[in-house]
């Protein structure tokens, strides 16, 4: 196979908000260039996980190579990198974008620009992309292409006069998109003679091949049998096979500059291949790695426990398998007095947490309980050291802590004008500070700084419900700030329940504690003795509810007779109850845990 002229290659990605038709457009492009026969076409070819298809989101970046003969008679190679659109996966997005020179910005002509479109477009602009706007769904009666064009120009500031109007569903005008890619996007640059330098875009685990690595060659040539070095992980491998995706794997002898393909090199674990790493030849390495590589840091932590303790080993095996495929997910063992053995897991964000939990339940048939999600706090100790706290139950003695810092995020919320008041109130209730508010057409764009701790519970659900689903939300972590945070413990019958302890802001502690106690009062079944349910900060009780005792009518056999006889029986019962309360164990049912952890409004 001869080397392709570099000016016939186009690497592009598609940037869009969820549901604006990104994967459908990708399907049409694949169909039109004849990469798959009609029989093999399924909806959303590139979203290979069931969960991706069902939720209509793209999680892992995928790629496909299309051959397209343009109207000028030349055959071009188009490498489409399908990027995730969701905020939790921004790092994956940035790496996919770094592998391309241009982007198609897909905007739904009936809905206009959304918050995540903005976030990803700005990333594309940061990566110096040429951007071609595409208006999708123009066959809908509600489509307003002119208004949306104007919106793109106002909000994003790119020229939308030549935006391509299409309908990905019906296949209308798709050819024009391909022509625009060829005409407007720049070809890649690269030097064949230079030492090998390639960007590791993504990696996943294949049962037969081991780890498959998706690469974009920047300089040099990657050949079969070469010995390569991953510069960030500092590991050396021999390349077994090289190929490209048309969406099916097809082997090739070599990949030249500007090309995108995959390699396998009997790598055992996905954790050894870090997204964004630089790959070079071991014998003749490149001088400097590619910029922008950073190890993935989990943001949200929560404990996952099997409902049935006997399932623990299965859970451990399942976690290991998922970790093979998703290096951004981390876990370690933990035990809890209330829930038994389980794992403390770290995630990129809430969607990531939901997806991992759903995949564990679905693909491995496990029943799981997850504890309340928490974020990573920084504790500045009195002796001058700094510790990270992942689990509120491990909090050291308050006297040894100087200050506690919590992560803050910068959130951008786009909402229709009618719901602006409720959205501002929600942000205010969550200890937010307003940074900016301006109007984009008929919609308000609000920028807020919020503590991540307040967002991880149910901020997203609340935002959707107060705006009837119209508000869209995007965030990135900005910095750590000192906060007046306290550890709230829940005591049942004067015994602390570790799985329910949490760090809260002092101003919110009382209301949160009271709500938790009320909830548990309804959920824990009554026992033969009275049970106090308390919320405490240190030694100070801030809220209490009492679960009444079930009492047996001991005086039922006394008909009439002396009052002292009845009193003797009642006193005897009282003594017994007192003893029970001292030694009695309160069993908290699983349902109570699940419901108490879900509670948060």
From Swiss-Prot:
GO terms for biological process: positive regulation of translation. Residues 7-189 form the tr-type G domain. InterPro entries: EF-4, EFG_III/V, EFG_V-like, EFTu-like_2, G_TR_CS, LepA_C_sf, LepA_CTD, LepA_IV. It is a peripheral membrane protein. PROSITE patterns: G_TR_1, G_TR_2. One of its GO terms (molecular function) is ribosome binding. Its EC number is 3.6.5.n1. Keywords: Cell inner membrane, Cell membrane, GTP-binding, Hydrolase, Membrane, Nucleotide-binding, Protein biosynthesis. GTP binds at residues 19-24, 136-139. Its main location: membrane. GO terms for cellular component: plasma membrane. It catalyses: GTP + H2O = GDP + phosphate + H(+). Gene3D superfamilies: 3.30.70.240, Elongation factor 4, C-terminal domain, Elongation Factor G (Translational Gtpase), domain 3, P-loop containing nucleotide triphosphate hydrolases, Translation factors. It is an enzyme of class 3 (hydrolase). Required for accurate and efficient protein synthesis under certain stress conditions. May act as a fidelity factor of the translation reaction, by catalyzing a one-codon backward translocation of tRNAs on improperly translocated ribosomes. Back-translocation proceeds from a post-translocation (POST) complex to a pre-translocation (PRE) complex, thus giving elongation factor G a second chance to translocate the tRNAs correctly. Binds to ribosomes in a GTP-dependent manner. Belongs to the TRAFAC class translation factor GTPase superfamily. Classic translation factor GTPase family. LepA subfamily. This is Elongation factor 4. It comes from Methylobacterium nodulans (strain LMG 21967 / CNCM I-2342 / ORS 2060). The gene is lepA.
């Amino acid at each position: 196979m001869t080397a392709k002229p570099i000016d016939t290659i186009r690497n592009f990605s598609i940037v869009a908000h969820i549901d604006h038709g990104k994967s459908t457009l990708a399907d049409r492009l694949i169909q039109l260039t004849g990469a798959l026969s009609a029989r093999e076409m399924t909806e959303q070819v590139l979203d290979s996980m069931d969960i991706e298809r069902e939720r209509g989101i793209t999680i892992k970046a995928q790629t496909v190579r299309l051959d397209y003969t343009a109207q000028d008679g030349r055959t071009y190679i188009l490498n489409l990198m399908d990027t995730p659109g969701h905020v939790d996966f921004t790092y994956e997005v940035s790496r996919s974008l770094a592998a391309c020179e241009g982007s198609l910005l897909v905007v739904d002509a009936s809905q206009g620009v959304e918050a995540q479109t903005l976030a990803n477009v700005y990333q594309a602009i940061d990566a110096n992309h040429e951007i071609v706007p595409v208006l999708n769904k123009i066959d809908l009666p509600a489509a307003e292409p002119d208004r949306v064009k104007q919106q793109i120009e106002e909000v994003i500031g790119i020229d939308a006069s030549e935006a391509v109007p299409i309908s990905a569903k019906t296949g209308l005008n798709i050819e024009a998109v391909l022509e625009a890619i060829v005409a407007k996007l720049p070809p890649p640059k690269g030097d064949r003679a230079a030492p090998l330098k390639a960007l590791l875009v993504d990696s996943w685990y294949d049962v037969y091949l081991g780890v498959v690595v998706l690469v974009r060659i920047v300089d040099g040539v990657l050949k079969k049998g070469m010995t390569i070095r991953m510069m960030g992980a500092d590991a050396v491998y021999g390349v077994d096979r090289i190929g490209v995706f048309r969406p099916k794997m097809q082997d090739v002898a070599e990949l030249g500059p500007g090309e995108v393909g995959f390699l396998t090199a009997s790598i055992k674990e996905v954790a050894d291949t870090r997204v964004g790493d630089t790959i070079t030849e071991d014998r003749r390495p490149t001088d400097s790695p590619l910029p922008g590589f950073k190890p993935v840091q989990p943001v949200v932590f929560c404990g996952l426990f099997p409902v049935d303790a006997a399932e623990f080993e299965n859970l451990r095996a399942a976690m290991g398998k998922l970790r093979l495929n998703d290096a951004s997910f981390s876990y370690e063992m933990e035990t809890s007095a209330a829930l038994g053995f389980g794992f403390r897991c770290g995630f990129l964000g809430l969607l990531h947490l939901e997806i991992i939990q759903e995949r564990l339940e679905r693909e491995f048939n496990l029943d799981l309980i997850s504890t309340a999600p928490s974020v990573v706090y920084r504790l500045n100790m009195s002796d001058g050291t700094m510790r990270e706290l992942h689990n509120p139950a491990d909090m050291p003695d308050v006297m040894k802590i100087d200050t506690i810092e919590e992560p803050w995020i910068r959130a951008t919320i786009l909402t229709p004008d009618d719901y602006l008041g409720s959205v501002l109130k929600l942000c205010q209730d969550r200890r937010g500070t307003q940074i900016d508010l301006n109007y984009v057409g008929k919609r308000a764009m609000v920028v807020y700084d919020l503590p991540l701790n307040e967002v991880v519970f149910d901020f997203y659900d609340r935002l959707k419900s107060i705006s009837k689903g119209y508000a869209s939300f995007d965030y990135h972590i900005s910095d750590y700030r000192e906060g007046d945070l306290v550890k709230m413990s829940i005591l049942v019958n004067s015994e602390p329940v570790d799985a329910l302890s949490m760090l809260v802001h002092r101003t919110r502690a009382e209301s949160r504690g009271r709500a938790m106690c009320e909830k548990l009062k309804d959920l824990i079944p009554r026992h033969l003795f009275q049970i106090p349910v308390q919320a405490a900060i240190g030694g100070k009780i801030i809220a209490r509810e009492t679960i009444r005792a079930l009492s047996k009518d001991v005086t039922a056999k006394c008909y009439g007779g002396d009052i002292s006889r009845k009193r003797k029986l009642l006193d005897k019962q009282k003594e017994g109850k007192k003893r029970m309360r001292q030694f009695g164990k309160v069993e908290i049912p699983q349902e109570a845990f699940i419901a108490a952890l879900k509670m948060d409004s």
